[in-house]
Amino acid sequence: MRCPFCGYEDTFVIDTREIEDQKVIRRRRECPNCKNRFTTYERIEEKPIMVIKKDGRREPFDRNKLLAGLQRAVVKRNIDNEKLEAIIDEIITNIRKQGVSEITSKEIGKMVLEKLKDLDAVAYVRFASVYQEFSSLEEFAKLLSQMKEE
């Protein structure tokens, strides 16, 4: 690798470490010409996840869009963003483990509901009401009675 300080072509790797659950490799390098040290990072370039919408459109998975939906579900609940980020990380990991490059928004919604069910009942009901497009009080009552049975 070329030295960013003097442009010398051949640098040495002094230290190598895996970080972020072995998805990134950090290398500490030294230039034999100018003796400066610098750090480089190697990442696996992952194929983007495409989301198949209800109407059949496909769009790239948007982490921020999912985070916004989760944040709406947990408004005025004592749940910090770190927990929401962890949920999103788990969902992305689950999708990648399936080995698919496309997934329906419905499947993502199911995954979110499973995570929220364990996290907070109110957030679960809020998310379910939007995800399942509740249009009556009876639908809320049915969901609540199902939750009580479990």
UniProtKB/Swiss-Prot annotation:
List the keywords (alphabetical).
Answer: ATP-binding, DNA-binding, Metal-binding, Nucleotide-binding, Repressor, Transcription, Transcription regulation, Zinc, Zinc-finger
Per UniProt, the unnamed Zn-finger stretches lie at: 3-34
Single GO BP term = negative regulation of DNA-templated transcription
Keyword Iron-sulfur on entry: no
Please state every residue range assigned to the domain named ATP-cone: 49-139
Q: Name one GO molecular function term.
A: double-stranded DNA binding
Q: Which InterPro entries match?
A: ATP-cone_dom, NrdR-like_N, RNR_NrdR-like
Give the cofactor note text: Binds 1 zinc ion.
What domain of life?
Bacteria
Q: Tell me the disulfide pairings in this chain.
A: none
What family does this chain come from, according to its entry? Belongs to the NrdR family.
The protein's job, in short, is: Negatively regulates transcription of bacterial ribonucleotide reductase nrd genes and operons by binding to NrdR-boxes.
Return the protein name: Transcriptional repressor NrdR
